[in-house]
């Protein structure tokens, strides 16, 4: 299992980014969470196989059709998750 923390920049709020990421994560078997941040970014903790995490990171670089992602920062993450949830804004 691999766990990564993503910080997604660009036009990523108000474009259904979080719900779209939850759907894609469920399709890939990725667990964790995604939330808006007050600074306008989206933050996500993703966990799964190397292949699944690589796939959700690739998706995160594009997001849903209305999004315009300019950068995705990636760090090692922590935690143990059973599902993928949309979390409250932080």
Regions picked out by a protein language model, each given a short descriptive name:
Residues 1-90:
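Intrinsically disordered, low-complexity, mixed-charge
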